[in-house]
Amino acid sequence: SVIAFGQTYNPSKESIKLSALQNLQTVAKNSLNELYIAQANYSNAVAARDKDFEPLTKLVTRIFNSLRASDSSEQTDKTVQTIVRKLQGRRASAKISEEDKKLLEEQGIEVNQISASQMSFDSRVENFGRLISLLSTIREYNPNEEELKLETLKELQTKLKQSNKEVVLASISLSNNRMNRNTILYSKISGLVDIAFDSKIYIKSVFGATSPQFKQVSRLYFKTRTV
């Protein structure tokens, strides 16, 4: 820490003066704390959404079987089955997170993510809504099971919409906090990393390249990143 250098550390450049460094340190720590909170909120929202959506595939199978067990026509069943199949679809490969995708791309690995069906959460909510709308027009669909009734399904649709919305909002917050962190740490000239380099150069000029003081700070490594 430059505090240990006392009055000997006395640069003329405003951005590397002790008070400026302390202020920047506080700002950087706050941005990191806010990012950690945003990451936790996003993870919690994703976990909650996964839990809410988990029973959907089995539920739509029950819905379809309930319809088939009624007096509905074969053509009606086929129309409903089209939507049901979309809700039951599977990915050709597991979906990776955007964070993992970026890390792979930084390593020069191109990531192709091909979906075999409409399994994004947005499309599942949309298709579930289409299924409910279609069922509401089918007079024969009148199950006695509470969890299969239209009103119950509509309540579930509202819950799924909200659950998905919470993830979207948490994702936006996470992205904004990550950009804020990157700006504070990696901006050219005004970012913490560039200012730290400037401070190290000043210490080198004051104490010398072979001095214990410079050796102490020269060991500190700062990774640069394009903002």
PLM feature spans:
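Basic/polar low-complexity intrinsically disordered segments
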Residues: 1-227
